[in-house]
Amino acid sequence: MRIDVLSLFPDMFSGPMHDSIVGKAIENGHLTMPVTNFRDYSTNKHGNVDDYPFGGGAGMLLQPQPIFDALKATEEQAAAEGLPKGRVILLDPAGVTFNQHVAEDFAHEEHLTFLCGHYEGYDERIRTLVTDEVSLGDFVLTGGELASMVMIDATVRLLPGVLGNAESAPGDSFSSGLLEYPQYTRPADFRGMTVPDVLISGNHGKIEKWRQKEALRRTYQRRPDLIDHDQLTAEQKRLLADVRIEEEERASRN
């Protein structure tokens, strides 16, 4: 996969995006991630990329010209590598909310471009370049850089061969539609807090059933809105019924 980033602050990506999983993906050839400063494409002699909005108002808007030209250049570079133009993602608080399903969708692409804004916003004509407008949530950041890093990390870890254990990503919270079940490592007894017996029983069938039940329990407790009953198997529905009874009994004791 190739991920292009258009940003006024490319140095922000030099650390986080070259460490851990994303860094290993680059090192192992699963990912290339050029970061382009679109100020370099400004035709203004002062290198300006923003201006006041027509009609007045607070703040400055990013001008279309530097971004149009920077995107054209990166798309030509991608084409030289045999890659399609790909999807152009505008980081915008008014966009659709990013989640695991969006990350999975992005992970199927060969080429993505993240457009990181700054200042008050964008000239509306920039949106003609865009295929997706995406937000991290109902809050405003100074720029799109931090949001794009989160989305890139969530996407890259889903690429085939990136994670050391191929089963890691499907087991993550939200990948199955449920939160992840509790996990434990050694020692089995730490300051009186013990690992559930089933996990050290060696009975893989019972372990899997326990994990399904505890994933349902955690989701029921913390994010019941995620539970789609139509998507649950008959076994999961039985386990969820047990969880509800147990949680009601626990609540009545408190």
Curated annotation (Swiss-Prot):
Listed InterPro entries: Alpha/beta_knot_MTases, tRNA_m1G_MeTrfase_C_sf, tRNA_m1G_MeTrfase_TrmD, tRNA_m1G_MTases_N, tRNA_MeTrfase_TRMD/TRM10
Molecular-function GO terms, alphabetical: tRNA (guanine(37)-N1)-methyltransferase activity
Cysteines paired by S-S bonds: none
A Gene Ontology term for the protein's cellular component: cytosol
Catalysis: reaction(s): guanosine(37) in tRNA + S-adenosyl-L-methionine = N(1)-methylguanosine(37) in tRNA + S-adenosyl-L-homocysteine + H(+)
Annotated binding of S-adenosyl-L-methionine, by residue: G117, L136, G137, D138, F139, V140, L141
Cell location: Cytoplasm
PANTHER family to which the protein is assigned, alphabetical: TRNA (GUANINE-N(1)-)-METHYLTRANSFERASE
Assembly behavior: Homodimer.
Matches recorded under NCBIfam families: PRK00026.1, trmD
Full protein name: tRNA (guanine-N(1)-)-methyltransferase
Species the sequence originates in: Levilactobacillus brevis (strain ATCC 367 / BCRC 12310 / CIP 105137 / JCM 1170 / LMG 11437 / NCIMB 947 / NCTC 947)
